Each structure stands twice: as C-alpha cells, then as structure tokens.
Amino acid sequence: MVPAPHTQHSPSSTMLNSSSTTAHAAPSTNGDVHAPKDHHLSSPSDTVSAPVNRKKQKRRQKQAARLAERQLANGHVSTDDTTQNGSSHANPERYHSDDGGADGPDHEQPTNGDVYDKDGQDSMDAHVDSQNPQGPNGTESSQKSTGRKSKKKKGKKARNNSHAQGDETSTPMSTPSVSMSHPLPPPLPSHLASHNILKPAKNRSIWNTSTQEERENIKTFWLELGEEERRQLVKVEKDAVLKKMKEQQRHSCSCTVCGRKRTAIEEELEVLYDAYYEELEQYANHNQGSFEKGSPMVPPPRLYQPPLRSPGQHTRTQGQFHPSRGRIHELTEEDDDLEEDYDEEEDDGDEPYSDEELDEEDEETRAARADFFAFGNSLTVKVADDLLKNDGKHFIDMMEQLAERRMQREEDTQYGIAAAHESLHSGHNHGPFDDEDYDDEEDEDYDSQEEEDYEEDEMDAMTEEQRMEEGRRMFQIFAARMFEQRVLTAYREKVAEQRQQKLIEELMEEETRNEQRNAKKAREAQKRKDKKRLQKQAKEEERARREAEKAAEEAAAKAEQEKKLEEQRKKREEQRKKKEAERKAQEEERARKEAEKLRRQREERERQAEAERKQREEKKRREEARRKEKEERELREKKAKEERDRKAQEEQAKKDTAKGGEEAKDQEKRDDQAKRSSQQGPVPIPSNLHHLQGFSPAVAHSPHVPSATPVLPKAPTPARPRQPSQQDSHSSSPHSQAPSTDPSQASLSPRSMPVSQSSGVASGNSQQGHGLHAMLHQPQPSTPLSPLGRSIPPGFSSVNGIPPNPPGLSGMVARPPVGHDLPSYPPHSGPFISPFRGYPAPSGIPAPPGINGARPMPPGRGFPLEPGQGFAFHGQQIPGAFSTPQGGLPHRHSRQPSGSLERSPLENHAQPMPISRPSPIKRPSSTQQDQQKGGDRTTQRDVDDLSAHLGSSALLDDTDVPLSSTLSQSLPGATAPGTFPGPARASFGGPSLFPDPLSASKHANFAVSPAVSGGTWGAQIPFGTSAFPSAQTWGTGHASGWSNNAFGSGGHHRAHTSRPVAIRLLVIQACKQLNTMSPFKGADGYHDVNLVLRQVEQLRPQNEPSISLKEMLDICDTEGNTQNGGGTFSIKKDETREFVKFEPDNNSAASGHRGSIVPGEIGSPVPSSSLPAFGGIGTPSVLRQYSSPPMGF
C-alpha cells in the first residue's frame, strides 16, 4: 500500500489539532469539571425520524463505507476531505458556543469527577457532522445524529461514573514525569478554556491563553524535552503497562505454553516500545517527511490533536489523518456504534457485554475485516479506554494474540495465511477471567463473520505481513493513546507549576498592597488620635482647676464636721468607761459567789468521800473479823474432824473384824445368791426393810465390798437412850454409829416380801454403799454449812419410807433405782440424787398429788415409756437403793428424844414391788484381811468427805444456838434452824400453807422432804402438822409422813441462794420498781433508804426474818457479780436522810440470760423432779432469776 502524499501531517497542522487538548489541560480549582451544554443541538421534534431497523441500517451504511473506501483507494478523493480534515479545529465559533453554554443557566457540575458530560460529546458530534452535509452519506447524517442522540439520552442515566467518555477523564497511570515531582492537578474544563478565548488580548497571561498559544506552548514543551526525558516518558509508560499485565496474569496458569506466551508478550512489548520510541524520536528530530518503508506510521502520539471526548471521536480524528482510506463517514458511524456499546455496557451492571452489543460488534467486526486498520483502530481505542479504567484484560488479550502469532510464525511457517489465522483461536489461552474472556467474544465474532461469504473472501486474502502490520498499528494506536496522556500530564505539571508560582507572586503582591494600605490607615488613625489627645488634655486641665476649688471648700466643711465628731466621741468614751466599771464590779461579785459555791461543793465531796472511806474501813474491819472467825472455826473443825476420823477408823476396824468371820462361813451361800441375782435380778424389798437394813453406817460408808449374806431377822435389842453428844456425833459422822437395831425392826421378817428378794437386798445395799463412797470422795469446802444443805444423816430412816399415796393422793410412785453403780453427777448428793435432770431421785420420792397412774420411770430413761392416760402413775412404791436404820435417826439440836418408830398409817397398804434392774456379778472379798486392807486405804478419805459435808456444825456445844441471821451466816444451800424447808418454785400451796423460805432450793420443783433436804436441826413439820392437824409427830415423819410441802420431797441438794445474795437481789428489785413508779422517784435515780427498805420488806418472803436497815446498807456495799445481780449501789447522805441508787453494769444483764437457761444446758440447774417445774408459784421471781448452781460440793 502506497501512502498518499498528504498522509503525514506537519507539526503545525498537528499543533492545530491539539488545541482542544490544550484548552482542557488547565487544572480545575475544585476537582470538579464542568461540561457545557450544546446549544447547537436541534430540538427533539426536529431530529426525530421514523424508526428503522438499526442492524439493517448499519449494514447498509457499512456497505456504503466500503464502496467509498474502494473509490478512495483508487485515488478518488472527495473534496470534502480537506474540509472534514480540519473540522475539529477550523470552526472557532464552536468554542464561542461552548462558552455560551457554560455561561447559561443550565450549566451543570457533575460531582462524580467526570471531566466531560455526554452532552458535550453530543455537541462535538453534532458539529463534526454538520461540517460535512454533502459527503457520500450526507443524506443520512441528520438521521444518524438524531439516532445517536436518542440512544445517548436513553443510556445517560447509567453513565455517572464512566471514564471512557473522553481521553481526559482521568489519568490511568499517574506516574510522575522526569521534570515534575508533585502530583498533577486535574485538567481544566472546556468552558474555562473557552472563557479564556473571549478575554481581551491585553489581559492574556499564564492564566488565560488562546488555543493557538496553547498549541505553541505544547509544541515548545515537547521540543524542549531532552532525549533522556523523552526516553524516560516512554520507559515509564512501558513499565506501567508491564506491571499492569503482570497483575492481570497473576492468576493465570503456570504451564509451559502460558509461560512461553508471557515471555513472548514481554519481548513483543519491549520490541514494540523500542520501535515506537525510535519513531517518536525520528518525528521529533524531523518534523516532516515520511518513513522509508511500509505504510506511513500513525502520527506521533496525538500530542497536538483535539481532545478525544469519546472513543468515537478519537476514531474519527484518527481516520481524518488517513484520507486515502476513505473512512470518514464510515468511521463516524462506527464511533456511534462504539458509543452505543459503551452506553449499553454501562447500563448492564452485571455483565460487560450485552447481547445487543455483541450483535453490533459482529457487524462492526465484519466491517473491520474489510479494513484491518479500521479494526485495529476501533479495537485499540477500546483497549486503551479499558486500560485507562484499570481494566487491562483486552490489552493483554491483544498482546497474547500478537505473541501467539509470533510463536506460530516461528514454529509453523509452512501453513501460510490460514495457519497464521488459525493460531488466533487455537492457542493455549488461559484468560484471567472466565466470564469476561475477550477471546471467546472474538471467536464468536469471527464465527459469525465466517458465515458471510464476502467476509471469508477477505479473510483468505489477508497475508502475514498484513496481520503484522495490523498488530503493529494497533499497538501504535494504543501506545499513542497512552503516551499522549503521559505527555499531557507532563505538560500539565509544568503549567501547574508555572501557575502556582504566578499565583504565589500575585498573592505576595496583594499582601504588599494590603500592608501599604494598612500602614496608610494606621498613619491617618494616629493623626486623629493625637488631635483627640490634645483636646482631651485641655479638658482635663480645666476639670482639674474646678476640682481643686471644690476640694478646698470641702476641706473646710470637713474640718468643721470633724470637730463636732470629736466632741461626741469624748462623751461616748466617758459613758463607756463608767459602764465598764459597773460591769467589772458585777463580774467580781459573781466570781466570788461562784468560788464560794465551788468551795462548798468541794467540802461536800470531801465529807462524802470521808464518809465513804469510813464505811469502807468499817467494812474492812467487819470482813477481817469475819475472816478471823472463819479461820478459827476451820481450825476447830479440823481438830474435831481428826478426832472423828480416828474414832471412825477404830470402830470400822472392829466392824470389819466381826464381819469378816461371818463372811468366811457363808462363802458358798454368797456365791449362789450372786448367781441367782445375776439371773433373776434383785427384787426390790419393802421400804421398811430398807429402813431397817439398807443404810447402816457400816454398809453405806464402808469402802469394802460387803458380802452378799441373806438378810435374817435378829433378836430385838432394846434401844439405849442416846445422849445429846452422841446424837451430835452420830449425826455428823456415819462411821460413829453402831449397827444397832430398833425393837421395831425385829418384827420385820423376810416373810413380808418374796423370798427371792432377800438375795437382792444385800447386793443392792453393797452397790449403793459403794456408790455413795464414790460420790463422797470429792474435795469439800471448809466453810460452815447449814444442816439444810447436807445429805441425809445416817440416823434417818429410809427415804423410801415416805408413803407413796398420802391420804387422798393416790397413784403416786417414785422412779425405780437406776442401778448399782451410782453416777457422780452431783457428787455430794449421795444416792438421793437423780442422775437425770427433771426426774425424782432413786430414793423413792413420790410424785405430786393429782398426777395418778403413771408408770415408774425405767432406769436410764429421761421420760416415761408408756404413760397412762392423764399422766397417771401406778400406785406402786419403788424401794430406794438403800435405807437407813431407824435407830440412827438424828434428833433436834435441842436434844429432843427420839419419837416413836412405828409405821405410819399411811404405809399400811400393800406395796407390790416391781423387779429391779439386776446387778452385775462381782467377786466378793474372800478373807477378812482383804476387807481390812481396803478399809485402811479409804478410811481417811471417807472421814475427809464427811467432815467436808457436815462442816463445823458438829463442833457446836450443847448450849450453842445457831446464829439468828440465817441467811447472812449460811452459804448457798443453807437453811435456818427452825425454818421450814419449802419449794423454791412450784409450791401450789402458797406462802400460807407451805411457806417458801429464801434458803429453799431453787431446783426443788416440788417440795423438799425432810428426809432428803436434811433439815434435822429443827422440829420437822410432818404432813398434816400445820395444815393437817391429825398428822403424827416429827419422829414418824421421816419414815412415813408426807413432806412439809404440798408436792412431796423435792430438792435433793442444798439451796444456793444465801441470805446476803437474796437481800441484795431484793434491794436491786426494789430499786428497779421504785424507778418505774413515778410518785416515788427521787432525784437522779436516788431513793430514800427507808422507802427502799419498805419495798424490800414487801418483797421478802413471810417465813424469812425481817431485814434491818444496817444489814441492807452493809449488803449494798458489796460488789456486784453474776451471782448477786451485778451492778453497784451509790449511797448519798445529806443532813437528815440517806439515799441509795442502783447502777447496773454488764453483770446485771446476765440476770435475764440466766432466767432463760433450760434444763440440760451447761450451767443450768439440776431439777429434782421427774415433772417439769410449775413456774414458781408463790416464790419471788428474783430468787429464780439470780439463783446459781450448787456451790461447795
């Protein structure tokens, strides 16, 4: 193919073609680019034509285009070619119209960063088409433009973010040039460049250059670039394209074929870019001329061409540089098709090419087959636009095709044109994206083209040289498109730098002008200030003169006023001094009175302290006297105890000697009896028999195991009269009594009870006697004890002799014995103490009257097993563990002779005996020597225990009388001689029938029996003596009479609320009651001692002796503890009276707690009855509240 003479354009014409590019290269101020609306477009009513078949129309147009190309190829050039050749820049009115469009009210500002709007492209297309109304296809130009406009309007809604509508949309690879190091500003919009054209010539500068000047500037910029800078631009472009290709092929396969293909692509790209740079260099060095071989090169990279607003416009301007090809109108139509393709591609969001677009591409490619340059031009534009949009798939496909052709040419040159063409489709292609593979679309295009005969003819006519030329032109077009952006970018950088420098200079000039202007204003303001200052100074002087005159007048008036004030001040000072003297005199008088008052108070406190000191001294003297007396008594008691121990040992030795011989004879009988007792168990014997034999001193207190001899009746021996001294000695020591019998004992024989009981009596007695010894083996206090707190003396008859059913009170029975080995719970209480709290002792104390028919409690049980209805006990008398010989009954201290020992009529009824618990078998002492050895070891301990129990009462002379103050001289548990031991809690009879003394046991829930409480010093009141006149004398009261209380025998140990403690508790209660009684309240809680004494007398039990005032005051001096109620008493005296006040402390709070202790807890009292206490009827609550556990065991 021989080029036409005017194929290569001169630089000047190229410069003219690039005016629009230069106009649009100015930077935008805000990043948004404005596109002018075209006012030359005809209205829709003018341009709308009848709808036609688009495909057929395109086919007809392309057929006409091919005919025109053949005519042009034959040398027939249309006269409109030259006109069309310069249509893009030969009409200056177009820019004015654009400017007018920009100034119009419909001026748009897209916000998506697009440089040009589609309306601007329509305007350009309309101008280009209107320039050639007489071309070969001139009759259809208006219809085509109208169709294009309608299609563009239809697809414009989806093209807000399109970058393919112009070549200035964005810079695809913003690689800085060698001359600039900062990023480029965006290109200047077309309407801003159009504004610059309308500026006057005198205002033209770097900010507003004309199109011609812009062209000259771009030309000068390109020519001024050195060889190295130009090569650097090409190198940057080549590196960017290689990098993009590598990114696109990163996910392709790694087979050998693909690897060779990639290598071939890189090599082909190197070769193409090197050849392209040589052509560029040649073009820059030789501004005009033609290349020596082949068809003419595509002009340099459209450096000075008009702006490519769309791929269509780019194609059209490229076609204008080859007028010999005759592609002017045909390319315009193809541009429209490509625009439609882009519009529809953008409308289709999910797939890159729609079916309609593929159909249009089929027609396009069929037309392009007739002209390879047109095909390459169209494809290259699209590939370049895709690469500008960061989508290099089409470019890579194009390069792969070139590489495949090269490899195919090297490997298989013998197949010629057909094989070369086949290599386009049979290559081992692995596109990076399966859904958007361009080769598949191209294959479809080629398949559809091959269906047409005339396309197949042209394909067969292609040669390898033409294919290579086609690929070369395609790459040149692509490289020109891309390189154009690089050159424009470099130029824009330079222009932006110049404008930036110019802007800085203008800003500096403006700042200088502002400074000068401000300086001038400051000078003028200073002048005005000076003028005002002078005027103000004159006014100040005038005002100062007037103020001086006024001050002089005021000073004279002030002096006169001060003189008057001074006189008034002197008068006030004199009055103040006078008042101060009077006030001081009053304060001195008040201070004197206060000092006198303090002195009197101090003297009063001193007198009170002296009185308290004297009281304490007196109290110390009394305590010292008591202590000495106590020591003397203890000394006497110790001597008497030693004497008694000596006598008891002698007597015990005699008894053991006599008894040892008898035991040796009856050894075999004792063994048999022991066996029978282990098999059958001991059968309780009548209580009278226990009275006779069960509690002899030798058996009860002998430390040896007695032999189990049968109880046989002895000959009656007349009882010899007992002397008072003997009675005293016997009552204080059980060892001193001889095992004598009463005449009444001789009448009792084993026939009055079952024969089987005789064997259990001795065994039971021996075990109980051993248990008593174990209990007595405890340290005892050496303080004198009242007889009420002692154990039953040996001379008593058995406690079991108390009738179980007093007259009118039937069905009462005591609890059976608890076994042979007595516990040691209260060790001092002997066999009369119950080992379980809340139940009667094994001594057979009957139950209270009115609770009938209840069964006896089995041993070891805390409650009755099967109580009858209504708490009825069986009317059976359980014999005690042991009994006391009747002859050993202690008498009154006044040596009253012993009374009758006959049985009480209350005991005459039959007493069935339940079988008691069997005793364990023990080996009796075989010889008298063994018994004597055991007696020697324990004699001394027994004597000590007895002396501790009996205290110093054994030392009393015949004429001695106990102290009158019973409570003040006794320890807890003591009772006064001549008083009636009564219940501490549950006396239903009240004080009139059964008085409740202060010394009564607080744990005796029912009555305290004379046999149990040990009150032997006074005449014991038998049941019926005071309340029942028909009762017998006291002599029979121990054996058969009912107790002196309403509910029989109760407390088994001594009471433990002494008289001082009781009186102190009464005083505390009286003070508390007076505090709560408003009429008797004293000042600050103090009460008159006489009033307190009257209140105490009201609270005192009737059977207690009266309390004197001195005794009460002495007790108030004692310190409080947990036993006596705690707290302290404050005594205050005045001229005539004494006052007392009780102040509680922490020990006082213990009273409420002790009242809430239930039986069974630590510190709780030991109840003496099997029935619960009935709440202390008739007993002061203060005694129940502040009573303590037994002391001095």
Curated annotation (Swiss-Prot):
Region (Disordered): 1-197, 288-368, 422-468, 508-815, 857-942, 966-988, 1145-1193
Primary location class: cytoplasm
One Pfam family hit: NST1
Compositionally biased intervals (Low complexity): 10-29, 64-73, 169-182, 722-740, 914-926, 972-986
Compositionally biased residues, Basic residues: 53-63, 146-160
Keywords: Coiled coil, Cytoplasm, Stress response
GO CC annotation: cytoplasm
Chain intervals with Acidic residues compositional bias: 332-364, 434-463
Biased composition (Basic and acidic residues): 91-128, 508-527, 537-675, 933-942
Cell compartment(s), UniProt: Cytoplasm
Bias (Polar residues) ranges: 76-90, 129-140, 312-321, 741-769, 1182-1193
Coiled coil (residue ranges): 448-659
Function: May act as a negative regulator of salt tolerance.
Family: Belongs to the NST1 family.
Protein name (Swiss-Prot/TrEMBL): Stress response protein nst1
